[in-house]
Amino acid sequence: MSRRNAPKKRPISSDPIYRSRLVSMVISHILKNGKKSLAHRILYQAMKNIEEKTEKDPLKILQQAVLNATPLVEVKARRIGGSTYQVPREVKPERGTALALRWLLSSARKRPGRDMASKLTNELLDAANEVGNAIRKREETHRMAEANKAFSHYRF
């Protein structure tokens, strides 16, 4: 790891259709092998599907899904005196959002089905309703932090 200064955060530009930074972040997380136009198509199709199914603003549902999947605490391994402890720590907002997006997309990819747009639609709707694999992952992370609360004095 570099001992120099931490790199500056690049500003995330908002997407052209929804004018939202969150949508741009989701597109960047969907991205595989540099095919950004495909990532755009997948997300916009998923948003259209959400609007057809719920007749609500898809951006609000996306925001709710990400908010519900965002963890507040996580555990980090810390080696002390020959044994490794799982030390709970708070999650910064940027990291929480990144984790939520990662979990939502990995859960969507694992779902059965043909196209990614429909799988992403179902995962986002489930997460907005506080069910689904991404929510389960967040709950599991919170349980781990709660179980290892005794080691919280080993700060980083």
From Swiss-Prot:
Task: Please give the subunit comment from the record.
Answer: Part of the 30S ribosomal subunit.
Its biological purpose: One of the primary rRNA binding proteins, it binds directly to 16S rRNA where it nucleates assembly of the head domain of the 30S subunit.
GO BP terms: translation
Question: What broad taxonomic lineage does this protein's source fall under?
Answer: Eukaryota, Viridiplantae, Streptophyta, Chlorokybophyceae, Chlorokybales
Xref: InterPro entries: Ribosomal_uS7 (IPR000235), Ribosomal_uS7_bac/org-type (IPR005717), Ribosomal_uS7_CS (IPR020606), Ribosomal_uS7_dom (IPR023798), Ribosomal_uS7_dom_sf (IPR036823)
Q: What GO annotations for molecular function exist for this entry?
A: rRNA binding; structural constituent of ribosome
Q: Which organism is it from?
A: Chlorokybus atmophyticus (Soil alga)
Protein name (database record): Small ribosomal subunit protein uS7c
HAMAP family linked to this entry:
Ribosomal_uS7_B
What coarse category fits the chief subcellular location reported for this protein?
A: plastid
User: What are the subcellular locations of this protein?
Assistant: Plastid, Chloroplast
Source organism superkingdom:
Eukaryota
Keyword annotations for this protein, in alphabetical order, are:
Chloroplast, Plastid, Ribonucleoprotein, Ribosomal protein, RNA-binding, rRNA-binding
Recorded name of the encoding gene: rps7
Write out the transmembrane intervals: none
The UniProt entry's sequence similarity note says: Belongs to the universal ribosomal protein uS7 family.
What Pfam family is a match for this entry?
Ribosomal_S7
Q: Which NCBIfam families match?
A: rpsG_bact
A single GO CC term for this protein reads: small ribosomal subunit
